[in-house]
Amino acid sequence: MGQTARMTRLTAMLAAAAAGAIALSGALPTNAAPPPEPVGSALPGDLAKAFQSASTSYDVPREVLVGIGYAESHLDGHNGEPSQANGYGLMHLASNPTNPTMSEASKLTGLPVEKLAKDSAANIQGAAAVLDSYADQVGLAGSARKDLGKWYSVVAQYSHSADGPTARLYTDEVYRIIGLGVGAAGVSIDPKQVTPDRGKYANVAPLGTRTPQSIAAVDYPGAIWNPAISSNYRVGRTAAISTIVIHVTQGSYAGTISWFKNASAKVSAHYVIRSSDGQVTQMVAEKDTAWHVGTANPYTIGLEHEGFVDQPSWFTDAMYRSSAAVTRNIADRRGIPKDRAHIKGHVELPNQTHTDPGPNWNWTYYMQLVNGDNPNPPTYNFTTYGAGVRVRATPRLNGTILLELPGPTQVFVTCQTQGDSVTAEGTTNNWWAKLRDQGGYMTNIYIDYPAAKLPGVPDC
């Protein structure tokens, strides 16, 4: 939804929360600085230390904490600004009628809400405290806490999802990330093969299970039907459909789906599209009016895209292509011209305070896809982490050093190739990215993405 910071809500939370007596020693940077030349295991950065400290203090596996943090935010606290569900920080501690994790974290840690919202280390501590409390409630203790698979029901509870299928969607994504491993924002976990103990969720049909009823309900044949609660949209239309609106969720895929099923949200969209693979969930029938753009609701269809406007790493080629297919299908069925006058960003509608999809959304590429072209994927935007990351003439550690990146930097990757292996913070990667503007190569290990190979980027 790409909204501006809603500090009035944070102020209300502060007024309602008891002031904490415990304080952590200062805010930690979102991106830790690794050594300039990684040839062995690097010392962990401050964010990595915060995860380890929280894990040790509350006996919650570090992999679980990092998996949740990456699923929620790609390990970015977004300067304490709220998500669409009023969640804060890289662990998405929330304050809404169905998700009390922020107030729980404040009570359990003694930390004030403002610190939990804005300080990444405090946010991680708060999440660990909540997870520890939930683990106690289900009797997860002793050596069983070392078994990552046993944490499944605890992670599902942490999601406070609207229903079982959405809770399973959320938790399966966390475990998928744990399986892939993470190397982002100075934090790394090695890939782990984990067999989740789904408990009561074992009998919950995963979101996307198709039935004759769900197939009949969707307007776009490739979509999964998972309806929003009826109090979050209006049945029917008062105007002809003429415009398709592109949104960014300012939150996770599972979290957005759950929020649209929450009666207190008073918002919805017709479609939600996942970053990792372009999965499409339809939540409101096109014949009905979703609540996503205020006065423009009656004549628009809304597409929400998982991610945050200030993090281009969420905008994968899989998501662009999947979304464009949905938009093209809608336009063709409804006779809507496939141009920018009729396919707009949220920010372009009247009387909006929202900024999505933001400057990182590639409109040129998207419209080419909508119009049925098959362009080469664009140069992909990613963010590096750390200071002193070297760009070399070749993907080799003995390649000529062209320059060093001074700190977290947005880079434009044209392709990727295998080269020398680089090890940092216990993770090894032999994939290198070719940078458009710097004219050389950097190791993928210092690009903010959890897998060794960057998504959608072609091989050199």
Residue ranges and their predicted role:
Residues 64-69, 90-92, 243-248, 268-274, ...:
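Structural recognition of the beta-strand scaffold that forms the well-ordered cores
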Residues 1-34:
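Secretory targeting and sorting signals
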Residues 43-44, 194-294:
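N-terminal catalytic cores of peptidoglycan-degrading enzymes
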